[in-house]
Structures are given as structure tokens and as C-alpha cells.
Amino acid sequence: MNRLKEKYVKEITPALVSKFEYKSVMQVPKIEKIVINMGVGDAVQNAKAIDTAVEELTFIAGQKPVVTRAKKSIAGFRLREGMPIGAKVTLRGERMYDFLDKLISVSLPRVRDFRGISKKSFDGRGNYTLGIKEQLIFPEIDYDKVTKVRGMDIVIVTTANTDEEARELLTQVGMPFQK
């Protein structure tokens, strides 16, 4: 069993039950999935950009991403419907816990001038979104092979009903929130 999953079962669940006074263990919020999305705006002019983004996301997530395509044509962006404009990957189960563990313990500390992540990025329904400005913070990415620095969005979807419950869950897991 993964280190984070074990911690969740043995330590976090009892702590959350006592703090929020749940009647059942099944009411305790848990992390459902993690979605990593990388928008590739320059894929409109450069078709190879989408391939490198897919390759980098595969290294980061350990799973092959899906290429996202434009829903509408936008003349101002020279964009046609159906053109590839990004890549996303959804992690669940064991891979999700592995990725979260790596994100918290290895990748986030590598961010320049890191003082913790914002407490304001909850959506009101217990989900947390984290924006990362460069893919170089992940140890799987080889610095010399990077052609362009790209950012990504990481969405942590939980079963929590309120932001307060989700914040407590993520704090217990070890997310480094700002003081």
C-alpha cells in the first residue's frame, strides 16, 4: 500500500471523524481523483508542440494523457474546431497517491521562492486547483530536453462537501498551505 494511502487509513480518517463528528466512517472526505491539464496555446502554429506536451505529461503522471481539442472556432486565435490545443490526464487509485506523494515531498519544494500554496484556490465544493508555472519542478523532466517552459493545472477532486473539510483533509495529507 502506498505511504499516503496508509497514512489516510490509519491517521487521517480517525482525526477527521473526531474533528467533524461524522456518524459513519464513509462520510469522511477522501481524494477521488487528480486531473492534470496542460494547455498548449502554441499548438495552433506548431503541431510538434502538442507531441512534446503529451510526452512530458506521460513522464510526470506515469500514464498516457488524452489530447484535448477545441470545441469552437475562434478567428482571433486562428483556431478551428477540432484542432488539438492541450493534453490532460486523470489519475485515480494507486497512481493518484503516488503522484500526490511526489508532488508534496519532491516537486513543490523545488519551486523557486516557494512559501506554500494558496488557501484560496478551493472551488466551494471541496475541490482544490493548483497552477504550476513550469514543468521543470518535476524530477522526471530532463532540463536539457525542454524546448519551452510550460505550465499546468492540477485539480484535486475530493468527496468533501465544504471547503473547510477539504482544506483539513489536504492539510492532514501534507499539502504545504501558506500560513
UniProtKB/Swiss-Prot annotation:
One function term, GO molecular function aspect: rRNA binding
tRNA-binding recorded as keyword: yes
UniProt cross-references to InterPro entries, sorted A to Z: Ribosomal_uL5, Ribosomal_uL5_bac-type, Ribosomal_uL5_C, Ribosomal_uL5_CS, Ribosomal_uL5_dom_sf, Ribosomal_uL5_N
GO cellular component: a single term? ribosome
* Gene Ontology biological-process annotations: translation
Q: Which UniProt keywords apply?
A: Ribonucleoprotein, Ribosomal protein, RNA-binding, rRNA-binding, tRNA-binding
What assembly does the database describe for this protein? Part of the 50S ribosomal subunit; part of the 5S rRNA/L5/L18/L25 subcomplex. Contacts the 5S rRNA and the P site tRNA. Forms a bridge to the 30S subunit in the 70S ribosome.
Biological role stated in the UniProt entry: This is one of the proteins that bind and probably mediate the attachment of the 5S RNA into the large ribosomal subunit, where it forms part of the central protuberance. In the 70S ribosome it contacts protein S13 of the 30S subunit (bridge B1b), connecting the 2 subunits; this bridge is implicated in subunit movement. Contacts the P site tRNA; the 5S rRNA and some of its associated proteins might help stabilize positioning of ribosome-bound tRNAs.
**Family classification:** Belongs to the universal ribosomal protein uL5 family.
In terms of NCBIfam families, this protein maps to: PRK00010.1 (NF000585)
- What's this protein's name? Large ribosomal subunit protein uL5
